């Protein structure tokens, strides 16, 4: 365990976009998709540490209206998720990645055989000579995150009151 990894007892919160990550009240795997951005592929799924001292301030700076949906997930449950692909495991690690203005910031990192999966995963899948089935595996492991996340869906206003 490296110094930035979070302990299994911690919770993290993922704020989700109701337009692209929820359909008819159901959380979609897209809520946990790594995206390709103009400045490069995402390396982790953005979350906030629920028990961090700055959590309420940080999350309210992100959602000033306090009405966005969010899900609370236990780090221990996240890190128990595993999926085997081509004799290598896909696993999650949750690490603190604080910034100057958002100190409760953390990320859910996806690894394949010890390599961080970035964006659509081409970087890791090419290292292991894994082809077209790779997208299927990424969706399958994201569905496991959905199973954890859908247990505790709430709103920013509700979670800040807790």
Where are these regions (language model features)?
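Glycine-rich short-loop/terminal segments
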Residues: 1-43
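Conserved NAD+-utilizing ADP-ribose enzyme module
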Residues: 2-8, 36-43, 51-162
């Amino acid at each position: 365990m490296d110094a930035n990894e979070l302990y299994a007892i911690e919770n993290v919160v993922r704020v989700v976009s109701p337009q692209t990550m929820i359909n008819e009240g159901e959380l979609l795997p897209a809520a946990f998709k790594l995206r390709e951005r103009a400045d490069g592929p995402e390396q982790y799924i953005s979350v906030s540490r629920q028990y961090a001292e700055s959590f309420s301030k940080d999350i309210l700076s992100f959602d000033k209206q306090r009405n966005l949906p969010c899900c609370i997930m236990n780090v221990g449950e996240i890190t128990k998720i595993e999926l085997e692909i081509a004799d290598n495991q896909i696993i999650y690690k949750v690490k603190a990645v604080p910034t100057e203005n958002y100190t409760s910031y953390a990320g859910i990192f996806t690894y394949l055989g010890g390599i961080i999966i970035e964006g659509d995963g081409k970087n890791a899948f090419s290292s292991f000579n894994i082809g077209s089935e790779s997208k299927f595996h990424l969706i399958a492991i994201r569905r496991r995150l959905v199973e954890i996340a859908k247990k505790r869906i709430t709103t920013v206003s509700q979670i800040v009151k807790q």
